[in-house]
From Swiss-Prot:
It catalyses: chloride + O2 = chlorite. Homopentamer. Belongs to the chlorite dismutase family. It holds the Pfam family Chlor_dismutase. This is Chlorite dismutase. It comes from Ideonella dechloratans. InterPro entries: ChdC/CLD, Dimeric_a/b-barrel. The keyword Metal-binding applies. Binds 1 heme b (iron(II)-protoporphyrin IX) group per monomer. Its main location: periplasm.
Amino acid sequence: MKVRCVSLVAAGLLTIAGSAIGQPAPAPMPAMAPAAKPAMNTPVDRAKILSAPGVFVAFSTYKIRPDYFKVALAERKGAADEVMAVLEKHKEKVIVDAYLTRGYEAKSDYFLRVHAYDAVAAQAFLVDFRATRFGMYSDVTESLVGITKALNYISKDKSPDLNKGLSGATYAGDAPRFAFMIPVKKNADWWNLTDEQRLKEMETHTLPTLPFLVNVKRKLYHSTGLDDTDFITYFETNDLGAFNNLMLSLAKVPENKYHVRWGNPTVLGTIQPIENLVKTLSMGN
């Protein structure tokens, strides 16, 4: 009986073994896909942010302190790399434009224009910028903030003919080399006009500017309640004569009587890559 049981067990094991050997080998497990590389930091889309409403902007003008040039030359040579590292850190949330004002302005050597969808992101960049060697030796001489908005007055609905003129005017000059930042503040009389009265004033304001739009690019930022001004006007041009004539035409419109601030400061600078600007101001005394 014992022998028979052993034989049955042995036969069973052989049957199991035979079944395993007789079956085809299982397919190999598929190789694991390599881990995906982290996505590269994607910079803010410049064209998109410059044309969108609701975007925050910070303008700040700076004067280099004379004691910056007491810093060792080797350290000043590294200033541009340090600033560029800050730009790289924040490139997903801000775009930064730089302008050299030294030689044009008494109270500044350069200014920055920072755009961001979130005001906190612009502030974070500026805080980090001021912590660089170059930033620590740059005193802020003016600071203005604002936001972009859709057209308030010369829109398709309110003023279709002028809107068509604005939309059809395309900059056709050489690449702009110069930029202007001009703050504007209106008086209480302006804000107490009816919407229809302000629309009429703005139509009178807009009409004489149309011939200059082929020579001068412009952008408007709204600051009421955000700063001590109502608007920040920004212009780019390669034709300073055309810009001067544009300003003369604006000075002659009735709407100018509502201004309590136009400029003060008016800041003129040359458009510069920020790396070049830092190198220029770090090497020269």
